[in-house]
Amino acid sequence: MTDVERMVLRPNHEGEMCPVCGDRVSGYHYGLLTCESCKGFFKRTVQNKKQYQCSAEANCHVDRTCRKRCPSCRFQKCLTMGMKMEAVRADRMRGGRNKFGSFYKKDRAHRMQRNAMRVSTVQVPAVLGAQSQAQTFYQPPEHQVSSSTTDQNNQINYFDQTKIKTEYIKTEYDAHLQSPTLSSSTNQQLSVSDFIMRPGYLVDPQDSLAVLLGSTIDDPLLRHTFPAAYQLNEVKQEPFDYSEQFIHHSLHDYPTYTSNTTNYATMMPMTTVSSTQSLVTSTSSTTTGRMTEASSTSPILPLCPAPTEKTVDHFYNSSIAEMCKTLPDDAQIARIFTSVKGTSKPEKHAFSIQVAEENLKDIVIWAKNDQLFSKLSLDDQMILLQTSWTTVHIVDITNAMVHGNLLSQYKMSNGDEVPVGLVALLGNQTFVSSWNDVVIRLRNMGFTNFDYCAFRFLALFDQSMDSFPAVSTARSRVLQSWREVRCTTAFLEIFEQIRRLAYDSLRYLWNLHSNCPTNWEQFFPEASLVLEMIRTTVNRSASSSVTAITQVPAIQLPTPQATYTAVPYMAS
C-alpha cells in the first residue's frame, strides 16, 4: 500500500496536538481528540472516583513534560477542554458509551475527504491501463470555479508533490469537532466506500462539504467512480447510521443542482457560545432564490457547557461513598467488647446479650441521623428498628471478623473464652458454624467497606417493609449506589443468609424468655433494651395478620452456597 493510499484510507491525525497536554493525538476519547496518556488518566480518575487537590493555586501549567505533576489541574483541564465523565464505563469494560457514533463516523469521513482533496495528481497503478494513469483525485478546473470563489492555489500547494505528504490545516469547522459530546474511544479505519460518494450524487448547497471548504466549488471527486484496485477487502468498514437526515434526495425541479457551477454562501466564522446559549442554525438562500430551512441543513451538534464544580460534586455525591461517611469506625465493635468485659457477668449468654445491648444503642443513634429514616413517623421508626436491629448487629460483628478486628475466640473477665459467633447470634449455639462459613466466604470474596455500608442500610430498610414509600425509595437508592462498585449477586445471597440467621437468633431469645424464665432472669436484667424490643415485636405480631414468632417452625440452614428466599418478617 502506498503512502497516498494510507493517507486516504484512514483518518489523519498527524500534526494534531492534544488540547490538554500537547502530546500527539491518537483519536477520539470521551468526547475529545486527545492523546493516549490523557485518555487513560481521565478514565482512571472517573472509574476509581479519585478526588485530587492542588497544592498550589489550582492554575498549574499542564504540558507533555509536566502533566503528571498536578493531577488536579490536569483533570480540571480535561473537563474544561470537553471530556465527558458520563462517557466512561462504570463497569470497567472495554469501549465507551457511544451516543453520537454516527456523527464521529461522518467526521472521520470528512477528514479523509479533505486529505484526498489536497492531492493534486496521483498516478494510478499500471494494471489499470495507460488511459487511467493521468487520473486525478482532485483538480478543480478553472471553468468550474465561480467568481466568488477564493483562491484555491494555497489549498492545493499544501500537498508536497515530492514526498507525497500533507499537513493538517485546522479550519473553523473543527470547532464543532471539539464539542464536548460523547464519543467512542475506538479508532477504527474506514474503507474508501465509506467516504467516497457514489456516482450521480447531487451536491446539496447546505452539505457539510460547503462548511468545510467555505467556497463555491463543484467537486468532481463526489461523482467519480473510484478504481476497483482501491477497494481493499482487508480494511474493516465501520457501520454508518443511514438515518433520514443523512440521505440526500434528488430534486428534479431544480436542474441547476446538476450544473457545472454551484454557488455556495460564504461560511462565516463560528462565534463563541456561552454556557447558557445554544448554537442555532440559521437559514440561508441559494442562487435560485429558494429558501432552505434549518432542518434541511447538515446536522451540527450544539456546544455543551463545561462541567462546573457543582455538577462534578453531584456526580460523586450520588455514589455509595457518601453513605460510608455515616458508618461507625472499624474499632467500634472491639471497643464494645472491651467495655462489656468489665461490667457483665462472666457467662456466655449474659456477655452476648450485653454486647447486643450496647451495640443496639449505637444502631438507634446511627439510624436517627439518616435523612430518610428521620423523615418517618415515630411509630414507623420503631417498627423498622424492631425488624432490623438483629440483622444490623450480626452485620457489624461479621464485618469486624472479616477485617481482623476480632479474633474467633474472645476471653472474658474470668478467663473463659466465648466464640465471637455465639456473641453475634445472641447466644444461639446452633448456627455458629453457619455464621463462620459466612465470614470465610465474605473474606474470600473481598468484602469491602462499600459492601459493609450496603449491608447495613439494606438491613435497616428491610424489604419486608417495602409497603412504606420511604423505605422502598431508600432501598432503591442503596442498591443503585452499590451497583457502582459491585456487579455480582453473590453478596446479596450472603446477605439473605445473614437475615435468616438474625431471624433465628431473635426467635431463640423469645423461646428462651418464654420457656426458661428462670434462666432469663438470671442472665439478663429486667430493664434490658433487647428484652423490650422482643416483647414489643411479639405483641405487635400477635395482634396483626403476620405469623407470630412462636408459630414459625425451626429453620434449618442449607449449605452456604444455596440461594435463600425472602424472609417472612414479623412486621408488615
UniProtKB/Swiss-Prot annotation:
In which compartments does the protein localize?
Nucleus
Q: Which Gene3D superfamilies match?
A: Erythroid Transcription Factor GATA-1, subunit A (3.30.50.10), Retinoid X Receptor (1.10.565.10)
| Domain of life assignment | Eukaryota
- Disrupted gene: resulting phenotype? RNAi-mediated knockdown results in embryonic or larval lethality in the majority of animals. RNAi-mediated knockdown results in embryos that do not survive due to failed epidermally mediated process of embryo elongation. Of the animals that hatch, larvae display a squat body statue, referred to as a dumpy phenotype, have uncoordinated movements and posterior patterning defects. Larvae also have anterior patterning defects such as kinked or notched noses. Animals that progress to adulthood are sterile and vulvaless.
The Swiss-Prot or TrEMBL record annotates one GO molecular function as: armadillo repeat domain binding
Q: How does it assemble?
A: Interacts with lin-39. Interacts with nob-1.
Q: What is the name listed in the Swiss-Prot or TrEMBL entry for this protein?
A: Nuclear hormone receptor family member nhr-25
